[in-house]
Regions:
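The feature captures the beta-strand-to-loop junction immediately N-terminal to the Walker
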Residues: 37-39
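Conserved ABC transporter NBD signature motif
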Residues: 60-68, 80
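Short coil-to-helix segment of the ABC ATPase nucleotide-binding domain corresponding to the Q-loop/switch region
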Residues: 97-105
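Conserved ABC ATPase signature
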Residues: 137-141, 145-147
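Conserved catalytic motifs of ABC-family nucleotide-binding domains
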Residues: 158
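Catalytic Walker B motif of ABC-type/P-loop ATPase nucleotide-binding domains
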Residues: 162-165
Length: 223
């Protein structure tokens, strides 16, 4: 599902050059749940951005879901992203749209037949326990509810890969546990998951393979 070979990422040039990632190599099998951990600034977000081609690597090869991401043409990026669901630390919901409309919007962009949009959107909301809040607007949601909506939006297109970038970073322990449980439920249905977190207390609860970044380098791969 994911393969990185000797991937490095450098920002800037000359004396101001900063190495965000250095010589990263690993493989994630289809259906695997991988925890990407490390302190803030270790390179976790940069690595995820490379996977969905928000950034291009300075060196190395990246393959994701059958796409040669490092050589992908700009016109092919939307095809890659159709196979990936993404959840951020900030839910990034559209402020002027209801929870249902936020989720359904993804399907409309993908050209889903109109008759399929409503049942698929409600199925995604049901999966994250948010059906009762379908007509609420983002400003009416708690932080936990907003992340549930973000998760529903990520899974509504039935992606083969879910990238979760610090989705529990702004949540208290109880809410974080709920989101974590939902992500594990999604994984149990066959979705490959890469879950990034700097919260060391979460890692033992996940009990999954762990990749640890420090200073832009992969220093541990275990589990």
């Amino acid at each position: 599902m994911i393969r990185l070979q000797h991937v490095s990422m450098v920002f800037g040039a000359g004396p101001s050059q900063v190495a965000a990632l250095t010589d990263i190599s690993f493989h994630v099998a289809k259906g695997e749940f991988v925890v990407l951990t490390g302190p803030s600034g270790a390179g976790k977000t940069t690595l995820l951005r490379l996977l969905y081609r928000a950034e291009s690597p300075s060196e190395g090869d990246i393959d994701v879901a059958g796409f040669d991401v490092s050589a992908l043409r700009r016109s092919e990026i939307p095809r890659l992203r159709r196979s990936i669901g993404i959840v951020f630390q900030d839910a990034k919901l559209l402020a002027g749209r209801t929870v249902f409309e936020n989720v359904a919007f993804v399907l409309r962009v993908l050209g889903t037949p109109r008759r399929e949009i409503t049942p698929k959107a409600f199925a995604a909301l049901k999966a994250v326990g948010l059906s009762a809040r379908a007509q609420a607007f983002p400003h009416q949601l708690s932080q936990g509810e907003a992340q549930r909506a973000s998760l529903a939006r990520a899974i509504v297109k039935s992606p083969g890969l879910l990238l979760a970038d610090e989705p529990t970073g702004n949540l208290d322990e109880e809410m974080a546990g709920e989101i974590l449980g939902l992500v594990k439920d999604i994984w149990s249905r066959g979705t490959t998951v890469v879950f990034a977190t700097h919260q060391a207390r979460l890692v033992p609860h996940l009990r999954r393979r762990t990749l640890r970044l420090e200073g832009g380098r992969l220093v541990k791969d275990e589990g």
